[in-house]
Amino acid sequence: MASKPGPLSRWPWQDLGNYKETQLIMVDERRRRRTRNGCFLHCMLSYALVAPWAVRSTYRFVRSGSGERDLLAFAVLPVLLLRLLYSQLWITVSRHQTARSRHRIVNKSLDFEQVDRERNWDDQILLTALLFYAVNAAVPVAQSVPWWDSRGLLVAALLHVGPVEFLYYWLHRALHHHYLYARYHSHHHASIVTEPITSVIHPFAEELVYFTLFAIPLLTMVGTGTASVAVANGYLAYIDFMNYLGHCNFELVPRLLFDVFPPLKYLMYTPSFHSLHHTQFRSNYSLFMPLYDHLYGTADKSSDDLYERALQGRAGEDAPDVVHLTHLTTPASLLRLRLGFASLAAAPAPPASRYGAGSSSSSSSSLAAVACPLAALLGWTRTAFRSEANRLHKLKLETWVVPRYTSQYLSKQGLYAVGRVVEKAVADAEASGARVLTLGLLNQANELNKNGELYVIRKPSMRTKIVDGTSLAAAAVLHMIPEGTDEVLLLGDAGGNKMAGVLASALCEREIQVHVVDKDLYESVKQQLRPETHEHLLHLAEWWSHSAKTTKVWLVGDRLTGEEQRRAQGGAHFVPYSQFPPGAVVRADCVYHSTPALVVPDAFEDLHACENWLPRRVMSAWRAAGIVHALEGWDAHECGARVTGVDKAWRAALAHGFRPYDRYGAN
């Protein structure tokens, strides 16, 4: 909201909500699931406002004869859906460009607060549909407009260049008067780093005034009998395009356009021109045409220079210091990336175990239905793509996503193909000049690349350091174990479980008894211990032994079945040491801890998307390990059998501002 919200600042349906998930982070998974379902219901309620009009217009269109159909009303619903899709495409393209492009204009941090403030970007599309339906019902002549009338195109163009642009310019200057600015326009200007949807983030009263201006050409066309469905909706498309262009925060308007037609400089603004309005505030007030800024002397003198610099791009911006290589978990996770739905990316995803999907709520099912066609197209892609770019002090950090899903990593048939994509991503990271590469989720699976060691074996001279993050992840697990614990139960698989070995070794060094039920895991872990610590590692022959029943701390791997959970005594702590949540929660009297993670330093910039199921500004320990590696300047790999050192990694992480994180609660 504005700093001092004025009358009619709230949108009428604000309490119903829009297509958004909650930003609240619940510790109780059952409450999290109910909250997500509630937000999905809110989405349905807000868009249900359009439903009666849409049903009525469709019914009338079908029942009417070919010469009596109300084309304008019938087109409202498909145009609404197309505008939603078009807006989302702009969000995706803009975020992709600002993560990788040298042509980014404002190089400042975008945070979760801005994402929350701009969650209602679809309100203006919903309002447009409602107003179109209302005017169509109130003005009979609007019910008989044709598909096309070229005269309306001329009317719309002249009225936009004249009254609309002129009135908007002076209205905009008035909104920068301290009285109106504090009550209305400051809400829009709270976003210094703009995104395409920033263009439509205004209080309701301010948006109504803008709609009144944009209605001048539309109502004039209706009144003069020159209106048509194509021109009316084409005018909306023009407004959307110019709005999103001006706020996309990367320069894409080619110089050739202005060289071929120099007057275009006064008829079309550029992203860099409007960005100055958001950084300087007292210049570049024009809507889409800088003509009036030049006429009244408010054009920023640095506009041309900024345009040239943004078009040329920043030298050296392409080389990241640290690349984190992750992958998709499910098709729906595609929409939860930073490049997907902004509000979903800013909220933790439902926990998904390695061996199955997470939530089965109606909202998750709907997301999966939307994502499946996109997932099918993405299956043809054989290159990892940039999803996120962050900064910490002087480090440039990037997150790359392998376009493959957890199920494909677990499939013997698909593992070879996945391996080729991951290996190419590793080669691309080195070619980009990255100093450190971290392997997230199953990108470091033993059966895929032996915790990254395969790439070092194939290229011993590799300059980029491969970091699997085992040391820091083990340290994070140790921090979650309650103080005073003298024994733990270690569960997991034996197959290449480096994490279990490092963790057990650290526990035995601290003289904590480690009980292992699985014989193969016991033998695997024992080989990684110093002989003098073997006495602290015990093999339990049976699940129902006294030690298994009474141990209060369970260290669990990728899978924790309901049957296993029921064997624990009340009050037991389940502490995952895997990158994936181990499974569904079935005990109400036990404590379930987070997967190993750290809270990022306050200086960490441009973080506005959650990492999978972790909450805001929390990062998996494996990802954080690479950043610490680069900050410390360590010139060694941590992959395969190589280990940085648990205590060494933990001390370094804390020294650089990372903080322990442990989300847990009794269910």
Where are these regions (language model features)?
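Non-catalytic, topology-defining segments of multipass membrane proteins
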Residues: 1-186, 190-224, 286-289, 293-391, ...
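Extended, charged/polar low-complexity intrinsically disordered regions
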Residues: 354-422, 426, 430, 436-437, ...
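Adenosine-phosphate binding glycine-rich loop
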Residues: 382-385, 389, 393-396, 403, ...
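Rossmann-like NAD(P)-binding element
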Residues: 516, 537-581
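Phosphate/diphosphate ligand-binding glycine-rich loop within oxidoreductases
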Residues: 419-473
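Histidine-centered catalytic micro-motifs
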Residues: 167-194, 199, 239, 243-252, ...
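Glycine-rich phosphate/diphosphate-binding loop of Rossmann-like nucleotide-binding domains
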Residues: 482-552
